[in-house]
Protein backbone atom coordinates (compact mmCIF):
# COMPACT_ATOMS: atom_id res chain seq x y z
CA UNK A 1 0.00 0.00 0.00
CA UNK A 2 2.86 2.35 0.83
CA UNK A 3 4.55 1.63 -2.52
CA UNK A 4 1.26 2.26 -4.30
CA UNK A 5 0.84 5.66 -2.64
CA UNK A 6 4.43 6.65 -3.46
CA UNK A 7 4.01 5.66 -7.10
CA UNK A 8 0.68 7.50 -7.36
CA UNK A 9 2.13 10.65 -5.79
CA UNK A 10 5.16 10.54 -8.10
CA UNK A 11 3.11 10.25 -11.28
CA UNK A 12 0.69 12.95 -10.16
CA UNK A 13 3.63 15.25 -9.39
CA UNK A 14 5.18 14.70 -12.82
CA UNK A 15 1.74 15.23 -14.39
CA UNK A 16 1.33 18.52 -12.54
CA UNK A 17 4.77 19.74 -13.60
CA UNK A 18 4.21 18.89 -17.28
CA UNK A 19 0.58 19.97 -17.64
CA UNK A 20 1.55 22.54 -20.27
CA UNK A 21 2.30 19.83 -22.83
CA UNK A 22 -1.00 18.41 -24.02
CA UNK A 23 0.17 15.12 -25.51
CA UNK A 24 2.44 14.28 -22.62
CA UNK A 25 -0.25 15.32 -20.14
CA UNK A 26 -2.80 12.92 -21.65
CA UNK A 27 -0.29 10.06 -21.78
CA UNK A 28 0.78 10.62 -18.17
CA UNK A 29 -2.82 10.63 -16.96
CA UNK A 30 -3.47 7.37 -18.79
CA UNK A 31 -0.48 5.82 -17.05
CA UNK A 32 -1.40 7.32 -13.68
CA UNK A 33 -5.00 6.08 -13.67
CA UNK A 34 -4.01 2.57 -14.76
CA UNK A 35 -4.65 0.23 -11.81
CA UNK A 36 -2.67 -2.85 -10.88
CA UNK A 37 -4.79 -6.03 -11.23
CA UNK A 38 -5.83 -7.88 -8.12
CA UNK A 39 -3.72 -10.78 -7.01
CA UNK A 40 -0.55 -9.40 -8.56
CA UNK A 41 2.49 -9.88 -6.27
CA UNK A 42 4.34 -6.84 -4.93
CA UNK A 43 7.49 -7.53 -6.97
CA UNK A 44 5.47 -7.44 -10.20
CA UNK A 45 3.78 -4.26 -9.00
CA UNK A 46 7.19 -2.61 -8.60
CA UNK A 47 8.21 -3.71 -12.09
CA UNK A 48 5.05 -2.21 -13.53
CA UNK A 49 5.79 1.11 -11.89
CA UNK A 50 9.39 1.01 -13.11
CA UNK A 51 8.15 0.48 -16.66
CA UNK A 52 5.65 3.33 -16.26
CA UNK A 53 8.33 5.75 -15.12
CA UNK A 54 10.55 4.69 -18.04
CA UNK A 55 7.69 5.30 -20.49
CA UNK A 56 7.13 8.70 -18.85
CA UNK A 57 10.76 9.63 -19.55
CA UNK A 58 10.45 8.49 -23.18
CA UNK A 59 7.29 10.57 -23.63
CA UNK A 60 9.00 13.59 -22.10
CA UNK A 61 11.90 13.32 -24.55
CA UNK A 62 9.61 12.83 -27.57
CA UNK A 63 7.38 15.75 -26.55
CA UNK A 64 10.33 18.09 -26.00
CA UNK A 65 11.81 17.15 -29.41
CA UNK A 66 8.66 17.50 -31.51
CA UNK A 67 6.08 19.70 -29.79
CA UNK A 68 7.78 23.11 -29.93
CA UNK A 69 10.30 22.74 -32.75
CA UNK A 70 8.01 24.01 -35.48
CA UNK A 71 5.71 26.35 -33.58
CA UNK A 72 5.41 29.78 -35.14
CA UNK A 73 3.90 32.49 -32.96
CA UNK A 74 2.34 35.66 -34.28
CA UNK A 75 3.68 38.81 -32.66
CA UNK A 76 3.93 42.50 -33.40
CA UNK A 77 5.76 43.29 -36.61
CA UNK A 78 8.85 45.49 -36.43
CA UNK A 79 9.51 48.28 -38.88
CA UNK A 80 9.65 46.53 -42.23
CA UNK A 81 12.13 47.58 -44.87
CA UNK A 82 10.76 48.21 -48.36
CA UNK A 83 12.31 46.36 -51.28
CA UNK A 84 11.28 47.03 -54.88
CA UNK A 85 12.13 44.74 -57.77
CA UNK A 86 10.99 44.23 -61.34
CA UNK A 87 8.99 41.22 -62.45
CA UNK A 88 11.20 38.53 -63.93
CA UNK A 89 14.25 39.42 -61.84
CA UNK A 90 15.65 37.74 -58.72
CA UNK A 91 15.07 39.26 -55.26
CA UNK A 92 17.36 38.92 -52.24
CA UNK A 93 16.21 39.69 -48.69
CA UNK A 94 19.16 40.26 -46.35
CA UNK A 95 18.74 39.97 -42.59
CA UNK A 96 20.94 39.64 -39.49
CA UNK A 97 22.29 36.36 -38.18
CA UNK A 98 20.69 34.86 -35.03
CA UNK A 99 22.44 36.03 -31.89
CA UNK A 100 22.29 33.14 -29.42
CA UNK A 101 21.25 29.97 -31.28
CA UNK A 102 21.93 28.69 -34.78
CA UNK A 103 18.26 28.45 -35.81
CA UNK A 104 16.72 30.72 -38.44
CA UNK A 105 13.22 30.73 -39.96
CA UNK A 106 12.06 32.46 -43.13
CA UNK A 107 8.43 32.89 -44.10
CA UNK A 108 5.70 35.17 -45.37
CA UNK A 109 2.72 36.82 -43.72
CA UNK A 110 -0.51 35.73 -45.38
CA UNK A 111 -3.73 37.76 -45.04
CA UNK A 112 -1.81 40.55 -43.37
CA UNK A 113 -0.80 38.92 -40.07
CA UNK A 114 -0.78 35.12 -40.34
CA UNK A 115 2.83 33.82 -40.49
CA UNK A 116 3.40 30.94 -42.91
CA UNK A 117 6.73 29.15 -42.54
CA UNK A 118 8.68 28.55 -45.76
CA UNK A 119 12.19 27.58 -44.68
CA UNK A 120 13.93 26.57 -41.42
CA UNK A 121 17.66 26.17 -40.83
CA UNK A 122 19.01 24.63 -37.63
CA UNK A 123 22.55 23.37 -37.27
CA UNK A 124 23.48 21.63 -40.50
CA UNK A 125 19.86 20.80 -41.41
CA UNK A 126 17.37 22.57 -43.62
CA UNK A 127 13.61 22.12 -43.79
CA UNK A 128 11.71 23.56 -46.79
CA UNK A 129 7.94 23.88 -47.04
CA UNK A 130 6.56 23.10 -50.50
CA UNK A 131 3.39 24.21 -52.25
CA UNK A 132 4.14 27.92 -52.62
CA UNK A 133 4.61 27.88 -56.43
CA UNK A 134 7.63 30.12 -56.02
CA UNK A 135 11.26 29.19 -56.69
CA UNK A 136 13.12 30.25 -53.55
CA UNK A 137 16.15 29.46 -51.43
CA UNK A 138 17.36 30.39 -47.97
CA UNK A 139 20.52 30.76 -45.92
CA UNK A 140 21.36 32.11 -42.47
CA UNK A 141 21.26 35.75 -43.59
CA UNK A 142 19.59 35.78 -47.02
CA UNK A 143 16.27 34.69 -48.53
CA UNK A 144 16.27 34.28 -52.32
CA UNK A 145 13.24 34.52 -54.63
CA UNK A 146 13.94 33.57 -58.24
CA UNK A 147 12.08 35.02 -61.23
CA UNK A 148 9.64 37.04 -59.13
CA UNK A 149 6.14 37.79 -60.36
CA UNK A 150 3.47 40.20 -59.17
CA UNK A 151 2.01 37.48 -56.92
CA UNK A 152 5.39 37.21 -55.14
CA UNK A 153 4.92 40.60 -53.50
CA UNK A 154 4.06 40.77 -49.81
CA UNK A 155 5.54 40.89 -46.32
CA UNK A 156 8.32 38.39 -45.60
CA UNK A 157 9.90 37.80 -42.20
CA UNK A 158 13.01 36.34 -40.61
CA UNK A 159 12.86 34.84 -37.12
CA UNK A 160 15.68 33.65 -34.88
CA UNK A 161 15.38 31.16 -32.06
CA UNK A 162 16.53 32.45 -28.66
CA UNK A 163 17.16 29.05 -26.97
CA UNK A 164 13.70 29.05 -25.28
CA UNK A 165 10.14 28.40 -26.40
CA UNK A 166 9.77 31.84 -28.05
CA UNK A 167 10.56 32.97 -31.58
CA UNK A 168 11.97 36.47 -31.99
CA UNK A 169 11.29 38.37 -35.20
CA UNK A 170 14.66 39.61 -36.43
CA UNK A 171 13.52 41.50 -39.51
CA UNK A 172 10.71 41.82 -42.03
CA UNK A 173 10.52 43.02 -45.63
CA UNK A 174 7.77 44.57 -47.74
CA UNK A 175 8.50 43.23 -51.21
CA UNK A 176 6.97 45.28 -54.03
CA UNK A 177 7.05 43.85 -57.55
CA UNK A 178 6.89 46.37 -60.38
CA UNK A 179 5.57 45.13 -63.75
CA UNK A 180 8.11 44.94 -66.51
CA UNK A 181 8.06 48.02 -68.70
CA UNK A 182 6.75 47.49 -72.22
CA UNK A 183 9.17 48.94 -74.74
CA UNK A 184 7.51 51.08 -77.38
CA UNK A 185 8.95 50.69 -80.85
CA UNK A 186 8.62 53.02 -83.83
CA UNK A 187 8.89 51.52 -87.27
CA UNK A 188 10.93 53.62 -89.65
CA UNK A 189 11.14 52.48 -93.21
CA UNK A 190 14.77 52.94 -94.17
CA UNK A 191 16.74 51.13 -96.78
CA UNK A 192 18.92 48.39 -95.33
CA UNK A 193 22.09 47.11 -96.84
CA UNK A 194 22.79 43.54 -95.75
CA UNK A 195 26.46 42.68 -95.58
CA UNK A 196 28.40 39.75 -94.23
CA UNK A 197 29.35 41.66 -91.06
CA UNK A 198 25.70 42.49 -90.31
CA UNK A 199 24.71 38.85 -90.67
CA UNK A 200 27.61 37.74 -88.45
CA UNK A 201 26.73 40.19 -85.66
CA UNK A 202 23.08 39.11 -85.73
CA UNK A 203 24.08 35.45 -85.57
CA UNK A 204 26.45 36.06 -82.61
CA UNK A 205 23.78 38.05 -80.74
CA UNK A 206 21.19 35.30 -81.22
CA UNK A 207 23.67 32.69 -80.01
CA UNK A 208 24.49 34.76 -76.91
CA UNK A 209 20.78 35.15 -76.13
CA UNK A 210 20.20 31.42 -76.54
CA UNK A 211 23.19 30.52 -74.36
CA UNK A 212 22.08 32.97 -71.65
CA UNK A 213 18.57 31.50 -71.58
CA UNK A 214 19.95 27.97 -71.47
CA UNK A 215 22.31 28.91 -68.62
CA UNK A 216 19.48 30.44 -66.55
CA UNK A 217 17.31 27.37 -67.17
CA UNK A 218 20.15 25.02 -66.19
CA UNK A 219 20.87 27.10 -63.08
CA UNK A 220 17.20 26.98 -62.05
CA UNK A 221 17.04 23.23 -62.64
CA UNK A 222 20.22 22.76 -60.58
CA UNK A 223 18.75 24.80 -57.73
CA UNK A 224 15.58 22.72 -57.92
CA UNK A 225 17.59 19.49 -57.73
CA UNK A 226 19.55 20.78 -54.74
CA UNK A 227 16.32 21.77 -52.98
CA UNK A 228 14.69 18.41 -53.68
CA UNK A 229 17.80 16.58 -52.50
CA UNK A 230 17.89 18.59 -49.26
CA UNK A 231 14.19 17.93 -48.66
CA UNK A 232 14.49 14.19 -49.28
CA UNK A 233 17.52 14.07 -46.96
CA UNK A 234 15.56 15.84 -44.23
CA UNK A 235 12.61 13.47 -44.65
CA UNK A 236 14.99 10.50 -44.43
CA UNK A 237 16.56 11.88 -41.25
CA UNK A 238 13.15 12.43 -39.64
CA UNK A 239 11.94 8.95 -40.61
CA UNK A 240 15.13 7.38 -39.24
CA UNK A 241 14.88 9.34 -35.96
CA UNK A 242 11.24 8.57 -35.21
CA UNK A 243 11.59 5.02 -36.54
CA UNK A 244 14.46 4.44 -34.12
CA UNK A 245 12.34 5.76 -31.25
CA UNK A 246 9.50 3.44 -32.24
CA UNK A 247 11.76 0.38 -32.44
CA UNK A 248 13.32 1.25 -29.08
CA UNK A 249 9.90 1.59 -27.43
CA UNK A 250 8.71 -1.72 -28.92
CA UNK A 251 11.84 -3.53 -27.73
CA UNK A 252 11.49 -2.03 -24.26
CA UNK A 253 7.83 -3.06 -24.08
CA UNK A 254 8.70 -6.60 -25.22
CA UNK A 255 11.42 -6.90 -22.56
CA UNK A 256 9.07 -5.68 -19.82
CA UNK A 257 6.37 -8.13 -20.91
CA UNK A 258 8.85 -11.01 -20.82
CA UNK A 259 10.04 -9.94 -17.36
CA UNK A 260 6.48 -9.62 -16.06
CA UNK A 261 5.60 -13.07 -17.38
CA UNK A 262 8.63 -14.47 -15.57
CA UNK A 263 10.20 -16.11 -18.61
CA UNK A 264 13.79 -14.99 -17.88
CA UNK A 265 13.45 -16.05 -14.23
CA UNK A 266 12.05 -19.47 -15.11
CA UNK A 267 14.77 -20.01 -17.73
CA UNK A 268 17.43 -19.09 -15.15
CA UNK A 269 15.94 -21.48 -12.57
CA UNK A 270 15.82 -24.32 -15.10
CA UNK A 271 19.43 -23.74 -16.09
CA UNK A 272 20.52 -23.63 -12.44
CA UNK A 273 18.62 -26.82 -11.63
CA UNK A 274 20.20 -28.52 -14.65
CA UNK A 275 23.67 -27.45 -13.50
CA UNK A 276 22.93 -28.62 -9.95
CA UNK A 277 21.76 -32.01 -11.25
CA UNK A 278 24.96 -32.41 -13.24
CA UNK A 279 27.06 -31.49 -10.21
CA UNK A 280 25.21 -33.99 -8.03
CA UNK A 281 25.68 -36.64 -10.70
CA UNK A 282 29.43 -36.01 -10.74
CA UNK A 283 29.63 -36.17 -6.95
CA UNK A 284 27.79 -39.49 -6.85
Swiss-Prot record:
How this chain sits in the membrane, per its record, is: Single-pass membrane protein
Q: Where in the cell is it found?
A: Membrane
Q: Which UniProt keywords apply?
A: Glycoprotein, Membrane, Transmembrane, Transmembrane helix
Glycosylation site positions: 79, 102, 111, 147, 162, 174, 196, 211, 228, 234
Q: Cellular component GO terms, alphabetically?
A: membrane
Q: Where are the transmembrane segments?
A: 239-259
Keyword field contains Cell wall biogenesis/degradation:
no
Q: Does the keyword rRNA-binding belong to this entry? A: no
Signal peptide location: none
Family the UniProt entry places it in: Belongs to the RL11 family.
Protein name listed in UniProt: Uncharacterized protein UL6
Organism (species)? Human cytomegalovirus (strain AD169)
Q: Which gene encodes it?
A: UL6
Amino acid sequence: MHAKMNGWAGVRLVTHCLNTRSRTYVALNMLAFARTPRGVPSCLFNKVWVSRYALVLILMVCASESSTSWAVTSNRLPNCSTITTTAGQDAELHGPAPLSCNVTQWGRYENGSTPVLWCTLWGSRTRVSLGHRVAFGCSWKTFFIYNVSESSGGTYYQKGYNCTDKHITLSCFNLTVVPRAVQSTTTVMTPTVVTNSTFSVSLVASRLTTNSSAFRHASYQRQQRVGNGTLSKNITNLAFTYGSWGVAMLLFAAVMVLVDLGLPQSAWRRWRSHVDDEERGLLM
